[in-house]
């Protein structure tokens, strides 16, 4: 396949994702029409929408890389690739709405805060991601995933002491879970 044909195929895939969503998102939305009070389906929809946002973002980066022509840069000049990820924001925002619905229907549903943190991290909203991971750890102080991703958020925020603290917690939790 030529680079032009590949770029065209990626563009079509991105357009389809924006118009209908992924097959899994479509399936889950149909399921919610039948069972709008099913917290598990809402949770799965949130997961699928977050994944669709990441998938779209990956396609956008790949397309931008294909269209990037570093040979046009001056020698020694750094070139950056501009990627418009604005369309995937809709997936992330809809994922947050789905997770909020889970909290309304089943406040005790395990993992919601951690998943909300992942979405906020994808949105690059680090303060909200931090808040979600801290809530997840309040709910379950042995939540390895929340501890690990909280360490990443703190690293991205430049809070190295906190990043190390939560990375150590994640490592300890991982070792404990591996031993069991």
Task: Please report, for each region that a protein language model flagged, where it lies by residue.
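N-terminal segments that cap or nucleate solenoid repeat domains
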Residues: 5-48
């Amino acid at each position: 396949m030529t680079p032009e044909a590949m770029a065209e195929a990626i563009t079509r895939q991105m357009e389809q994702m924006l118009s209908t969503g992924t097959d899994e998102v479509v399936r889950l939305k149909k399921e919610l029409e039948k069972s709008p009070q099913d917290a598990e389906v809402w949770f799965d929809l949130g997961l699928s929408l977050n994944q669709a946002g990441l998938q779209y973002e990956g396609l956008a980066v790949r397309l931008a890389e294909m269209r990037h022509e570093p040979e046009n840069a001056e020698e020694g000049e750094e070139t950056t690739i501009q990627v418009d990820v604005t369309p995937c924001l809709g997936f992330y925002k809809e994922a947050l709405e789905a997770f909020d619905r889970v909290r309304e229907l089943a406040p005790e549903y395990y993992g919601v805060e951690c998943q909300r943190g992942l979405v906020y991290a994808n949105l690059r909203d680090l303060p909200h991601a931090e808040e979600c991971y801290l809530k997840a750890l309040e709910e379950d102080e042995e939540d390895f995933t929340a501890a690990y991703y909280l360490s990443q958020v703190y690293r991205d925020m430049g809070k190295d002491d906190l990043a190390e603290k939560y990375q150590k917690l994640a490592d300890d939790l991982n070792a404990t879970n591996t031993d069991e």
